Amino acid sequence: MFRRAFLAFSAPVLLLAVLFCCPAISLAQGSSAAATQAPATQAQIAALERQVQAAQMAGDNAWMLVSAALVLLMTGPGLALFYGGLVRRKNILGTMMQSFAMMGLITLVWAVIGYSLAFGRGNGFIGGFEHIFLRGVSLAPNPAYAATIPEQTFMIYQLMFAIITPALITGALAERVKFGALAVFLALWSLVVYCPMAHMIWGVGGLLNINGGLWPCLDFAGGTVVHVTSGASALVAAIYLGKRDGYPDNAMPPHSMVLSFIGACLLWVGWFGFNAGSALSAGPLATSAFINTQFAAAAAAFSWTLVEWLQNGKPTALGAISGAVAGLATITQASGYVQPMSAVVIGLIAGVVCCLMVLKVKKFFGYDDSLDAFGVHGMGGTMGALLTGLLASGAINAVFGADAAGHPRPVGAVDGNPGQVLNQAIAMGIGWVLAIAGTLLLLLLIDKTIGLRVSPAHENEGLDLSQHGEEGYEFSS
């Protein structure tokens, strides 16, 4: 009896104990499992983050290497063909060699000391010697310039800018300069003019750097660094060297518009690497610069052609391709800062103003800028500097950060920052002064030592034979 009563009483108690204990056991086991799984989950998340970062770096690096190749394409064969077709037949090889020589010579200068002077840590004017012979330039990123690509990729990309900038100057000296003298002049020019300007605007601690400079300058892809300096130097060099024999009394038309046409198309394509590549990553900013590049080139080709058509009664291929290059030069500085329709406006203005510089102003003053390096690049870069300060938008590139409410701070005058136009003008003025002073000093030095200009006999013979001993075209009798 007692046994039955005990079992009747204990059975429900045991059942309740099991019911209450099982969840506790389960929770204890779950807590133990969770404690075991937590580090594993965190490790998986960290591994995924590393994979995402590696994928981003691989994508950015691939885009930047392609962009570097596109910019090199601008010099050779792009600029070489563009300039080569514009000269007389007896000077085509000499002219193309001037561009090609920069691809080799400036590469060596850049590797030895140029990169260090432009992007090494120095003062507000020029970099130091920390990267001489590329010392310390590794496959690891340099966050001061580009956080998702190796510094060697950044270095080689910037090299392509250093190559094409002095090559642009050769257009003002076409058909009358000694090859050796030109090579020495441009190698020194890259150190005296280009590297300081690149450091002031793009280098850490630069006087005009957008991050902490005394006069922050918006120069996305080199409007001032490349086009103002090369254009101003081209004007000084053209005036110093003097006119070609027979200019302007004798007609000196391009010997092959076909070559120039092909060269201009290659320049246009390469410019996507020039501008969109300056985003230094394969992100939305590269897309913005890419679109602005296309829009400005198209608008400038249209407006130059229209002005020429209205004045002369016929549109020319030379006018169309010159307009496109003018638009590309002018949008360079603004490409990563403005809205697409602002790029159209910049292109339309560039085509008209640069056309008038070439057709009217050059004729009025009488200087012999043989291939219009100043009229297209110098004037285009100067306009681009000011128009960038006017039209830059924080909605495209919040380069000055955001306010407390999270809205982009004003960037250009249309954004509510009119002072940026003054900063742009100061930077552009410094570029002009540096280019004029440095170019004149080097020209005087070289002219007094090895001489700059070929003899009248060699000029009449042509640079192909007199400077290189070969001809661009062989015609069988």
Predicted ranges, named:
Residues 1-30:
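N-terminal secretory/membrane targeting signals
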Residues 27-477:
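Glycine- and aromatic-enriched membrane alpha-helices
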